[in-house]
């Protein structure tokens, strides 16, 4: 009996390993790990899951009408000295297109889920909107709302020349972010730059934390609590970026999901947990636009009868095939927005209104 159980366990392990290995290779491109967001340690999971439970109890298990949030955004566009509108110094129109995509996805008005009948009941409205900041940290009016353009020459290295993923992420975190970040308790800082041609990673973020956890590598602090995305992923279907499969703005949506406390749907290990009971387990990330239902019960009998939730924003599938968050994911995001430093003050400073300080004019 024991021998049979061991043999079965070994067979299941080999099966899951094979599935995960297959999913780690996108047949159309070398995009094995699209997100560079570090996996948070157990200490963070324990703390944040406790906060989620407190939030549920406070809001009657999330069944009352929850608050609406508006997050002011500043896009730091890193370029190589080219004219505005020439990549990577993308136009304000591309930024506006990306903002529209954020508001659609986080406003629960993404792609109509009727074609995915099994999961239509799990589509939730996060009730989160984004606006372009009108003023800088000194309260001066921005020439372009929500945009801060920066020549890469100030860093001595252009990120478009860095092909190693870890080197690229380290450069963003330890050189770029500390030099340009605006107060993360007031702004959602979004840094845009290009990557080296053979780098795989498309974005990264930091998880929310309380003051005692800000020393952990995976969570945000005053110098690194910003989201980074590859510029060619920025846009929407009407004004797209240029990266095939990932040109419609969903990369930034996913990274902001991490910024608001969401884990990947596969829990970052084979059949791991994202701590959301309404996202079925998955053996790993999915790519492309899988035929649905995809990988039914991949993690065990009866665990995902409708297949893996490949249309969830927190997967790696193509932008055209991702659109939804679930109620449990919304609760985690609202927990971050209401109870975490660097999140719970966002939107309280009037940064998207027109009360501002203008520079003094010439003497008359």
Give each language-model segment a name.
Residues 1-28, 102, 358:
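Bacterial Sec-dependent N-terminal signal peptides
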Residues 7-8, 38-41, 243-245:
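Short hydrophobic "helix-edge" motifs at membrane interfaces and signal-peptide entry regions
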Residues 8-12, 142, 364:
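Intrinsic disorder/low-complexity segments
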Residues 9, 13-16, 40, 175, ...:
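Intrinsically disordered, low-complexity regions enriched in Ser/Pro/Gly/Gln/His and often acidic
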Residues 19-106:
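Primarily auto-inhibitory N-terminal propeptides
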Residues 65-67, 73-136, 149-253, 259-362:
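Extracellular (secreted or membrane-anchored) zinc-dependent metallopeptidases
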Residues 139:
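Active-site pocket-lining segments that scaffold enzyme catalytic pockets across diverse folds
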